[in-house]
């Protein structure tokens, strides 16, 4: 991974399934809160087939405490779809990942780049913040047309990249630990501090 990166259970074995589970759990939930849920969930449901076949009451019990239960319901619907259409293996194709229930551009990008080394961006709020700060652009990062433009530009930069998953994870890590949203960013620790605001 990246020098100085946090040790996280989903990074130890970044299979498509484990990347998917972690990214869905991490939506609107802090990393430290997700760790024990991830461990318990993947121990009981180690693959797509187990998730697809899990009784709903047990599935919801495993998710209890994370909230936003539609996330796990959508995961199970997607798991059934993956079993039916892809033989239980998450597709190594960004566009096909996007067609799965509950998977948007960020999650599809994370799975494709981290698990399959496909050069597509995984752009979340942290990454948008980094890119706008480095570019000294004060455009509202919540503006959809601006987000689309940044994703397109990042996709172009990533073409031909040997380790797109590591690149995406490095950006995520930088945004979570150095180029933080609240409080003062730790600019002296940033590898891009000479280019930035």
What are these regions (language model features)?
Residues 2-188, 192-195:
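Catalytic cores of DNA base-excision repair glycosylases
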């Amino acid at each position: 991974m990246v020098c100085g990166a946090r040790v996280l259970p989903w990074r130890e074995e970044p299979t498509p399934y484990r990347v998917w589970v972690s990214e869905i759990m991490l939506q609107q939930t802090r990393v430290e809160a997700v760790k024990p849920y991830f461990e318990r969930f993947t121990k009981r449901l180690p693959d797509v087939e187990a998730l697809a076949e899990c009784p709903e009451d047990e599935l919801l019990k495993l998710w209890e405490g994370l909230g936003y239960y539609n996330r796990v319901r959508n995961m199970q619907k997607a798991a059934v779809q993956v079993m039916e259409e892809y033989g239980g293996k998450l597709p190594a194709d960004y566009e096909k990942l996007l067609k799965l229930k509950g998977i948007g551009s960020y999650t599809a990008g994370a799975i494709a780049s981290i698990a399959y080394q496909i050069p597509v961006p995984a752009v979340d709020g942290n990454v948008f913040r980094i890119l706008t700060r480095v570019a000294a652009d004060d455009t509202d990062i919540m503006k959809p047309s601006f987000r689309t433009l940044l994703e397109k530009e990042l996709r172009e930069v990533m073409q031909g990249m040997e380790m797109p998953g590591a690149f995406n994870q490095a950006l995520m890590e930088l945004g979570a630990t150095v180029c933080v949203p609240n409080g003062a960013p730790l600019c002296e620790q940033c590898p891009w501090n000479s280019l930035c605001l």
